[in-house]
């Protein structure tokens, strides 16, 4: 049965155009072709990426955070309370009013004290500013290097300037070492992101991020199997062109350099819109949808590849919506922040006031303490 499944999965009609077989893609005469077995190396490379990331965050990102004066807000910890902790872990982090009243009776605390306990407990679970900075630093470093390397891989190729040449001679297209390593490194990195997603900073688009990583891994793997390598290198470089800008904007945001963050974010938004909503659908997708049909009839691989490209395009539209919302806030003078991030709650949430007298009563609050001077912003 397993052999039958294996034979059906690797049936040439699924992966290759009509009248072509895997034998046509065997290495010969010094020409090397993409093979599925090449991708086995990406899993150990993904683990290597996780190790490199650990040491990078420890010995590079952490000192950089100190240099940029990335500071944590003081968080008041929720006092131990078995009753409230049990509810928090088993029933939910946001108790309804009826739950608050019940927990108040069970714990002997007032309703206001129960609400305060849950706010502090939720804040404890939120990732620290340093964790966010280190994660953004790692991704910025990879995406920047990947974009530079990817550009070097494709800039001297004829299909970079004439998309019809992407399919010239397809699928009998040999690969060169630079294409091989570009693919292996990109795929390994996305495997590492998928492996670490449970421990990384969780944002509101957590599910969309999982879909994106899975779709990207499938697309990169399939494009290698089916020898869509030329199209694949163009797509990967296009995606890397804006990602490093977003991560650098996050880094400056966490460091408190708001003007620099906002300026980089505007550049990122422009690059994202141009690459993901203009170049990708009207050039790259047109290239993968229209030009192949001029050479051979559509087959399963053709439909599958373009379907996955459509999934990515829908995610781009979703993220473009979030980006435009943030850009609108910037233009209208509001603070620009990551729309996907949860906001940290303060002790004054839901109208609660700190127990402080005199003029401090009406001052801004941070974790329940009046802020004496809230104007320490870096001047870029």
From Swiss-Prot:
Domain TLC span(s) in chain numbering: 131-332
Pathway: Lipid metabolism; sphingolipid metabolism
Record topology, Cytoplasmic segments: 325-380
Superkingdom assignment: Eukaryota
TM region positions: 41-61, 140-160, 181-201, 209-229, 264-284, 304-324
Residue span of region Disordered: 338-380
Subunit structure: Interacts with ATP6V0C, ASGR1, ASGR2 and SLC22A1/OCT1. Interacts with ELOV1, HSD17B12 and TECR. Interacts with NDUFS2.
Domain notes: The last loop motif confers selectivity toward behenoyl-CoA (docosanoyl-CoA; C22:0-CoA) and lignoceroyl-CoA (tetracosanoyl-CoA; C24:0-CoA) as acyl donors.
Function as written in the Swiss-Prot or TrEMBL entry: Ceramide synthase that catalyzes the transfer of the acyl chain from acyl-CoA to a sphingoid base, with high selectivity toward very-long-chain fatty acyl-CoA (chain length C22-C27). N-acylates sphinganine and sphingosine bases to form dihydroceramides and ceramides in de novo synthesis and salvage pathways, respectively. Plays a non-redundant role in the synthesis of ceramides with very-long-chain fatty acids in kidney, liver and brain. Regulates the abundance of myelin-specific sphingolipids galactosylceramide and sulfatide that affects myelin sheath architecture and motor neuron functions.
Name of the protein in its database record: Ceramide synthase 2
Origin species: Bos taurus (Bovine)
Organism ancestry: Eukaryota, Metazoa, Chordata, Craniata, Vertebrata
The gene coding this protein: CERS2
């Amino acid at each position: 049965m397993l052999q039958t499944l294996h034979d059906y999965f690797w049936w040439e009609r699924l992966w290759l155009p009509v009248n072509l077989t895997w034998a046509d893609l065997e290495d010969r005469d010094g020409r090397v072709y993409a093979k599925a077995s090449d991708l086995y190396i990406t899993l150990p490379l993904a683990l290597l990426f996780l190790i490199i990331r650990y040491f990078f965050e420890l010995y590079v990102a952490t000192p950089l955070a100190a240099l940029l004066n990335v500071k944590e807000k003081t968080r008041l910890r929720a006092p131990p309370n078995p009753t409230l902790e049990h509810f928090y872990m088993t029933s939910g982090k946001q108790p309804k009013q009826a739950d608050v009243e019940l927990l108040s009776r069970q714990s002997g605390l007032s309703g206001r004290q129960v609400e305060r306990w849950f706010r502090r407990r939720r804040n404890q679970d939120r990732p620290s500013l340093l964790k966010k900075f280190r994660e953004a630093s790692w991704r910025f470093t990879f995406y920047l290097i990947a974009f530079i390397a990817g550009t070097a891989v494709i800039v001297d190729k004829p299909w970079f300037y004439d998309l019809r040449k992407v399919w010239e001679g397809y699928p009998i297209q040999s690969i060169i070492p630079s294409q091989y390593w570009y693919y292996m490194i990109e795929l390994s990195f996305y495997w590492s992101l998928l492996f670490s997603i449970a421990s990384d900073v969780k944002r509101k688009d957590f599910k969309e991020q999982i879909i994106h990583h899975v779709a990207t891994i499938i697309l990169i793997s399939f494009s290698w199997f089916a020898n869509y390598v030329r199209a694949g290198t163009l797509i990967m470089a296009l995606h890397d062109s804006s990602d490093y800008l977003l991560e650098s904007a996050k880094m400056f945001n966490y460091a408190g350099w708001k003007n620099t963050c906002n300026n980089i974010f505007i550049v990122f938004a422009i690059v994202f819109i141009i690459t993901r909503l203009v170049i990708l659908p009207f050039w790259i997708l047109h290239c993968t949808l229209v030009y192949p049909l001029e050479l051979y009839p559509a087959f399963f691989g053709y439909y599958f590849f373009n379907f996955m490209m459509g999934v990515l395009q829908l995610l781009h539209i979703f993220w473009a919506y979030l980006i435009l919302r943030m850009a609108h806030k910037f233009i209208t003078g509001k603070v620009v922040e990551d729309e996907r991030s949860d906001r940290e709650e303060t002790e004054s949430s839901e109208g609660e006031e700190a127990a402080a007298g005199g003029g401090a009563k009406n001052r801004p609050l941070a974790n329940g303490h009046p802020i004496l001077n809230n104007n320490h912003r870096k001047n870029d």
